[in-house]
Amino acid sequence: MKKIVALVLALMLALSMLTVATAETANPVAGKKVAYIMLLPSATIFQMWKDSCADLCAALDVEFDFYFCDGDFNRWMDTINTCAAAGYDGLLVSHGNQDGSYVFLKELTEKYPELKLVCFDTQFYTDGEYQKIEGVTQLFQQDKSLVTVLLDEMIAKFGEGVRLVKVWRGPNYNSPFDRREVGWQEYEAAGKIVTVGEIQPLQDSVDSANSVTAAYLQSLNREDVDGVIAYYDLYGQGVYNAIFENANFNGEAGEALPMASVDIDQVDVTNMQTRPDIWYAAGTTDWTLNGEIAMRLLLLELAGEYGVDVVEIPGSAILASALKEDSTVENLGEIAGETYGNLSYLSVADWMPADLLHK
């Protein structure tokens, strides 16, 4: 009789352990609703981000929406407010500007205390100091490194004191540009680079970057500049077109003017393959992986497993000379350095897909 009782107790214990294990691995985010809200216009890299977010959400039965705000900060704030009021469980918000984002998002979290937030490339800054919002994870590219890896390549090509033109919008247009500017200023202060001039597109578009760069080149002597750095690849496409269309800078009369840009998409890869003497390099991270990193952080918050305040992903230089004939924006990991596509930045949990969606 004692043996029977012991067997029954052992069976009950095994079943209880199985029940606990099953509960522990149950999906805690099924049925949740989240959105990705980007300040900037849609671009290939942001679509890569969005698609990886959508794939992960689909795998975990999470409803996913996305919104691009075409560089309009008021529209970005309105979209966030609308989603919060509509009962979204979590928001992944991207590229808020330095001045207004902290106050706005802090008030949002106070008004909707159950709403979970992950912020990408968005600094919390007010009254001359960087701030923190309790319970909100900030994910960044190491924006400074996205510029400095390009500056390092220009220095390797031309030596210290290389003369460069900078293409950006700022200061305080958006947080990523301001963070990239830190790297530029450090190199300039150290005498590693010399700023020949600055170009500021009027809009976040290829056409705007093309027109302002074309006008600027008319006032510039080729012998007075070594290269151009664009803080955003959309601007880079406009810069490339302006150089390509100008006989004094495209290689028809002397050496072509080399340029490099932050971020990358398929248009950039094609241009780098076509004219590596013009589009010399790009500084980037793996945008497909970035989206999954960010969404995993948000889903962890929704599951009550918040663990970190800040995550930073280092940049890699993609050299035109390293591209293969079959290189695309999707397979850059084949030719990029080890910092590109580093899976160590991915959060994991028992209830998340064990086989990572993006490797």
Which residue stretches match the model-derived regions?
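Short, low-complexity disordered leader/linker segments with a strong preference
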Residues: 1-33, 63, 85, 107-114, ...
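Flexible loop/hinge segments that line or gate small-molecule binding clefts
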Residues: 106-145, 268-274
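Hydrophobic alpha-helical segments within soluble ligand-binding/sensing domains
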Residues: 28, 136-165, 209-212, 263-269, ...
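Extracytoplasmic "Venus flytrap"
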Residues: 31-52, 56, 65-78, 88, ...
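Hydrophobic alpha-helical
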Residues: 91-112, 117, 183-184, 202-271
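Hinge/cleft segment of the Venus flytrap/periplasmic-binding protein
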Residues: 30, 168, 286-287, 293-359
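Short beta-strand elements in bilobed, periplasmic/extracellular small-molecule ligand-binding domains
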Residues: 58-69, 164-166, 188-206
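Short, solvent-exposed amphipathic alpha-helices that sit
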Residues: 45-59, 146-150, 175-194, 208, ...
